[in-house]
């Protein structure tokens, strides 16, 4: 597999392998997901998030490549859990690819049934952006994580994390954004990770500053930085279920506690306490049922430590990996006594249609991204928080794979930025087209009662219709590719979510697509929250002339 691993890299420049730029964009982003700079285990087709994959197997991957190369401008390719299953003639304004990943009928929507289907070669776990081919490395979640810690700082620490110590765990593709997000907010963070290669990857990409296997050394570094008021991120090799209790026993003062281990998947994603990686691999292979049982017991112990830190005065929140649910299932009655990050810090942004707008340069030239950075500042001169974010990103973010950028934009802003990017492609200021997409974690694209839709005002946490409607409206609006997934972030049975990507190739057709998609997509977030009774969302809908047939009187 080593040769395959080395060979997967997105094309650059303006030479096409496909029959059009939309198809070429899909091919490049598929390959970009498996670039060794981007993916966690490219040799196994794993992009991030435990077993979040880009394709079901290598035969399916190569069949997708072949299909994309022959796909015409009026055809649509269908992907079922990472496998190409059909190609139909549609029309030029339809999506070029439609994807459904790991979607199970509700009664059967659990890990046991999923793994049974996976063993038979019938299904693949797509996570969120792994199976939808728009993952851009840890930067993809970076601004959302940064904004979460920034809001936490505003609520609890006077607007800055300077002089505070954060304790977290998990430095995979998503969790890897945590160290840099904390230091961008001037704080100190110890991030516990059981896999040393993951710590090394975050250090190589400048997301984490230092690593150690010694708790004593980590605490010395952290205290020195905290006392000096300097930001510092430390990757600590260890198991959170053990390390956290050791810190409690020592009476270490922690200001903030969260977690981004892959607790959503107790078999593949989480390492039980007391096991090395090698021992865990053997146990997983030989006794998977015992492994899951031990893994869940460790998660309970992990959450018990988080609750103990809360009792000692720390600000504690769940970062969307469903670890509270696992602990509750193991008998921990108060597992949900600390909130999830969305109701605590992010939902007000969702009510404005704000969410993770991202784009990647198909040219492969970083200068194309820097030009779009400048464009963003030109379009939104009054948004100083956005300017600060772009300045920090330019200084601190290392591109992984194709150069890309992430920023949170709201309703109206996304369309404005998308159309302006398309114009830069049209007039030749950019060397090649740009792909514009987002995380599935967005204002109107997810149903996830333990994460994005936790504690909705009207109790509609588990209503899955909204995620389906998001996929449908993006398809009707003509996104270049649209995806619908199950289980991302929080695991089987706990989420439904949709994604979209649109290609800015400078054409009039692209302009029309972008205008429709980048309006209706964030608009879904506004109508979803307005329907749930959020005053801010209803206000934005009224201000923006968004038609809601049965809008509630304000």
Swiss-Prot record:
Write down the Pfam families for this protein, in alphabetical order. Answer: Urocanase, Urocanase_C, Urocanase_N
Residues at which NAD(+) binds: 49-50, 127, 173-175, 193, 198, 239-240, 260-264, 270-271, 319, 489
Predominant place of localization: cytoplasm
Superkingdom in the source lineage: Bacteria
Which residues are named in the active-site annotation? 407
Keywords attached to this entry: Cytoplasm, Histidine metabolism, Lyase, NAD
Q: Gene3D superfamilies attached here?
A: Urocanase like domains, Urocanase superfamily
Database matches in SUPFAM superfamilies: Urocanase (SSF111326)
Q: GO CC: one term? A: cytoplasm
Task: Describe which pathway this protein belongs to, using the record's wording.
Answer: Amino-acid degradation; L-histidine degradation into L-glutamate; N-formimidoyl-L-glutamate from L-histidine: step 2/3
EC number in record: 4.2.1.49
Reactions this protein catalyses:
4-imidazolone-5-propanoate = trans-urocanate + H2O
Q: Does the keyword Transferase apply?
A: no
Any one Gene Ontology MF annotation carried by this entry is: urocanate hydratase activity
Cofactor binding, note field: Binds 1 NAD(+) per subunit.
Q: Which GO terms describe its biological process?
A: L-histidine catabolic process to glutamate and formamide; L-histidine catabolic process to glutamate and formate
Required cofactor names: NAD(+)
> Where would you find this protein in the cell?
Cytoplasm
Family note: Belongs to the urocanase family.
Checking HAMAP family in the record gives: HutU
* Described function: Catalyzes the conversion of urocanate to 4-imidazolone-5-propionate.
Q: What is this protein called?
A: Urocanate hydratase
Q: Which organism is it from?
A: Bacillus velezensis (strain DSM 23117 / BGSC 10A6 / LMG 26770 / FZB42)
Chain's gene name? hutU
